[in-house]
Amino acid sequence: MALVTCNFTSPSPSSGGSDLRRWNQIIRNQVLKGNVELAIHSYIDMQKLGFSADNYTFPLLLKAAGNASSLRIGLTLHGQTVKTGFCYHLFVQTALLKLYSSLGLFLNARKVFDKMPVRDAVAWNSMLYVYTSCGQMDNAMEIFDTMPSRDLSSFNIMISGFAGAQSVTSARNIFDRIPEKDVVSWNSMILACMNAGETAEARTLFEAMPERNVITWNTMVMGYLNNQLYTKAIDLFYRMKAGDIKPDYLTLTGTLSACSHLGSLETGVNIHIYAEKLKQASSPHVVTALIDMYAKCGSIHNSLAVFYKSKTKDIYCWNALISGLALHGFGYAALKLFNQMTVNCIKPDDITFIGVLSACSHAGLVKEGCEMFDSMKRDFGITPKAEHYGCVVDLLSRAEHFDSAFQLIERMPFEPGESVLGALLSACVIHQDLEAGEKAMELVVKRDWCLSDGEYMMFSNLHASCGQWEEAERWRNMMNDSGIVKTAGCSEIQVNGRFHKFLAGELGVE
């Protein structure tokens, strides 16, 4: 931690307790402002001047450690509370509990909790929170059942925990036991339903709520988005827009993502105009969502316009545009943007390389793609994942470098998954290379005898592309005998502001 110069007059130790209170106030102000380093350095300066921390100082410092997610600082402070005897004070014990809760260290938190001679509501709820945030719902339920008294926060923490565990029945049991529910209770229960895929029940709760806040609407919009009900997400956004509660950046990003999935440029443009009106269009989250939406809706020039207009570009903005350029086959432009990104001292991450490698694959830039793959670990310290190997296998296979693709698969530090083998098989079908295709089929069967409908169809199509009709029919029959049904294709179009869904084989519209 770098030395920080503090612009304040240091209290004198000869002044006594009043100046200790001044030190505590200085530290408190710095913690509230998020100046964790200043808070810690003030504590160090305070000790150098002969002041000792008390049961008010340590909770402030422990809060600073929690805000910085610094286990090292937290453990050091915990050790000092033990040495000074303040570890037995309720304020300090509660602060330690909150620290370990924020860091997800439920064993450390439980040790502190068990040693507390007196536990207030904050202590009980902190212990509940640490268990629920770590997914330890059985332990959380044990604490909940043994609590001498429960407040509304206790119930809400439990509902949120069960929501994260996708246990909607348990969440509902807690929800129904609440004497007086607040908006947090309802929001948490809606989240539990959405996480479990029970969107109709979530909507019923939403309509029954006595009051809603922006989090309520966002929970519904994101819930629909995560359950692939994109039209419902957009419809709800327009209903929210017509009401008293204004959408925030989360609402806008969620709805723009729904537009991306639907390919609805018209709706996306309308939301962009509305975001400008709300003065939210310059938010990095919204900028990223706009870049992604325009690219996936076929308007890459608008993606570029949004990107270059933005004054603040984080890693997500760069990644969104690189992926967008890849989607449109602009390989050299994606590589140029990658270089521009590094010149601007933006460090690429694993998502960046997925975009760049995908761009090289779509543009047929074999040499450049292989060089980028090699540079991941060498120049940026990023270990390639299955998705990166999948991109390079796709790159090599598209260019008919099947020997190199198989060699890369053999060198992989893990078993090839569906994304890797799927890319290989798909290229074999396109290039009608039966020899490479049969070798790829062996790898798929070796990996898992439970083939997907897509893999059965690719095996069949491979033989059909080479004129082996009987073998193609045999694979289709094997799929039918296994009880696997090919997933029907689905399309949605927007007509006069309304979305209509078409399923393959259907005559009507939804």
Question: What role is predicted for each listed range?
Answer:
Residues 1-123, 129-151, 156-510:
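Terminal (and in a subset, N-terminal) low-complexity or junction segments at the ends
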